[in-house]
Amino acid sequence: MVVVDSSALIPLAWVGRLGLISATFDEIRTTKEVREEVLVEGKLGTAALDAFFDAVTVHETPDDAEQVASMEGIAVADASVILLAEDGEELLLANDRGLIEVARTHGVECWRVTTLLLKCAKEGTVTSEEAIDVLYDLVDEGMNLHPKVYAQVQKKLGELGD
């Protein structure tokens, strides 16, 4: 089971790889705040995201999300997924450093998109070569990734292919 945030959904939608989430997790959950954040007409990947949400359980935003957002200095959508993951003791898939830092203070285990790619390559969902191509595509489409992290992930993916 996984709770997904827009920071992971959007880049995966840009490169047509939302299926990596459903291939890795049996149950996918998020909040209305996140759904509304990503379903924006005229934006790249919106149609793919809309179809993806057919298989996602979308929960109401937790009552205390606004208070947590205010106290932690994060967006309400970010607080909503942290609280949802915390409540169900679930993994949070996100790609936002600030959100991940706050989530960890709440005891929530977090994966980044790069972690998902590594998991998919290890399990054979994609080959290591395909995962490297996806990594390149993500960065090429605008996903922020430090060059050092890119090099480390690319190296690990290459080792999986050996």
How should these model regions be labeled?
Residues 1-90, 97, 105, 154:
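Active-site-proximal, substrate-binding regions of enzyme catalytic domains
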Residues 91-94, 111-112:
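Short hydrophobic alpha-helical runs that function as membrane-insertion/retention elements
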Residues 41-42, 100-162:
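Acidic, PIN/NYN-like endoribonuclease modules and their adjacent C-terminal/linker elements
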